């Protein structure tokens, strides 16, 4: 399919039709940068979706963290079910980069844990960009980090068509060059197996589909898509393209040229270190690099191969590395979501990476070429980005400068909801007053969000409210992601009534049940009480018709004054629109998606209980297969908390199956 097909029961409403028309007019007139100022609950994602459908251009949406990227991906996936909506974020569950601390002479080895499902989705994203046009890639800002060259990545593909001849040994060798592994016993993603006249391939971009190639001599007769779990045939294919199992696959002559380049740089660097009388650094660099060269010669790869990426891509020192932006077509469209946060992150990423690597190079742990394995500099990102729409409720200085201060506003909500009423109260007895406000709000069946300045204040206030028998919890950076999801679900379901946090605006909190947002010490100027932070926090109460905000302050700061003035301006515009069109504000009643549980076996169930639930091996194996498919499906839908529960249940059943056998 080459056209986007938006499927939704809703039509653009409020400010959305006007905003969509203005942005599209700007794109058609070749404006490079535009600013979409969308307040909380105004339907920014739906507006973006309509712009994408009408312009019919491949699109990249950048978000400032994985969580927000996942939310946008999920929404876009539901709006465009017939198109390629992809997810591209860092595939590390855990990442400790290599580093050297000179003052203590401590070297920290690189340590990481790769999430296979996210790696799969990254491959799916790059494949879609190279094969079709109806593509939306939702990415975190990590997409500006180096990636394999798109030219080499596409050059290394294996194209398969029935009726053509493929010498068996050459085909198997080509698959190995793509970093696929032969595994006739365990068939998993990135593997192939050979059975008689058939070759089965499990592509890197699939989790639940594989390809069976049926040969007569060297002639490929059929390509069947099948379920790798059950063996069931799903479809007959006219052609198939096998992409590399890594974005860093490359032909052997490229590897050989890279080895020569690395050896040449090594000799120059060793001579320089010797001239500086740095004998330890000389020995260290020679030993580490020679080992890497040996691994590259024998296997075509080595640990930390990305540090030599400049030699593989053929780029000169200082040139930008290939990134996801080089996979985009020339007429692509870019949305930068929450640009007031995303843009400063992009600016900061190069400098922090450079500072760490310069120490490694200086002390002989890496060659100077390792400095070119990096994220894009901000000015490079500026050069590479296509036509861009910045999206934020609180635009930053860069976006306003780029657009000449011209913004396209989304102020009218389709629901008719107004920006919340804001009240200033003295901070002297803020906790005492807060308790009475909590009492009144909770009595209405609504929830309360409270923001403090420090982690200790959040914990102390939570403990105090719990002593008073209020159902309270707190949220800050030390709370694990999955635990945070559970806390937010508990808040929406009423298991807890009050959530205390430090910087709640950064958590992406959208709680329709929220009736009160309390900002403690609102007059303490700083990052947490800046104009942008206050406007974002006030927005947390904008999804309920009874939403209110109390700012506890003993003096009127510039930030409070500007935040309240902007909120009042928006509220007046919304009121006038509602009166003119006879709209009554209506609270968003969004469904609460609870964590699903399986009745057949609990994750805490032991193997004896599993035996009683499934009295024979056949039943047990059937349920293991079913559970495994559900786990993979949950992971591919980014329902990681559900996938983790299914994984635990799967382990229990597998242990029971081993005992029965």
Curated annotation (Swiss-Prot):
Q: Which CDD domains match?
A: DEXHc_UvrB (cd17916), SF2_C_UvrB (cd18790)
GO terms, biological process = nucleotide-excision repair; SOS response
MF annotations from Gene Ontology: ATP binding; ATP hydrolysis activity; DNA binding; excinuclease ABC activity; helicase activity
- Domain Helicase C-terminal: start-end pairs: 430-592
Gene3D superfamilies given for it? P-loop containing nucleotide triphosphate hydrolases, UVR domain
Q: Which domain of life is it from?
A: Bacteria
What are the protein's UniProt keywords?
ATP-binding, Cytoplasm, DNA damage, DNA excision, DNA repair, Excision nuclease, Helicase, Hydrolase, Nucleotide-binding, SOS response
Q: Does the keyword Cytoplasm apply?
A: yes
GO cellular component terms, alphabetically, are: cytoplasm; excinuclease repair complex
**SUPFAM superfamilies, sorted:** C-terminal UvrC-binding domain of UvrB (SSF46600), P-loop containing nucleoside triphosphate hydrolases (SSF52540)
Is Ribosomal protein one of the keywords? no
Signal peptide from the UniProt entry: none
Q: Where is the UVR domain?
A: 621-656
Residue limits of the Helicase ATP-binding domain?
Answer: 25-182
Places the protein is found: Cytoplasm
| InterPro entries according to UniProt | Helicase/UvrB_N (IPR006935), Helicase_ATP-bd (IPR014001), Helicase_C-like (IPR001650), P-loop_NTPase (IPR027417), UVR_dom (IPR001943), UVR_dom_sf (IPR036876), UvrB (IPR004807), UvrB_inter (IPR041471)
Sequence motif: Beta-hairpin, positions: 91-114
Subunit info here reads:
Forms a heterotetramer with UvrA during the search for lesions. Interacts with UvrC in an incision complex.
Provide the function of this protein: The UvrABC repair system catalyzes the recognition and processing of DNA lesions. A damage recognition complex composed of 2 UvrA and 2 UvrB subunits scans DNA for abnormalities. Upon binding of the UvrA(2)B(2) complex to a putative damaged site, the DNA wraps around one UvrB monomer. DNA wrap is dependent on ATP binding by UvrB and probably causes local melting of the DNA helix, facilitating insertion of UvrB beta-hairpin between the DNA strands. Then UvrB probes one DNA strand for the presence of a lesion.
> Which protein family is named in the record?
Belongs to the UvrB family.
NCBIfam families named among the record's database cross-references: PRK05298.1, uvrb
The Swiss-Prot or TrEMBL note on domains reads: The beta-hairpin motif is involved in DNA binding.
Protein name, entry field: UvrABC system protein B
Q: Which organism is it from?
A: Rickettsia akari (strain Hartford)
Give the lineage.
Bacteria, Pseudomonadati, Pseudomonadota, Alphaproteobacteria, Rickettsiales
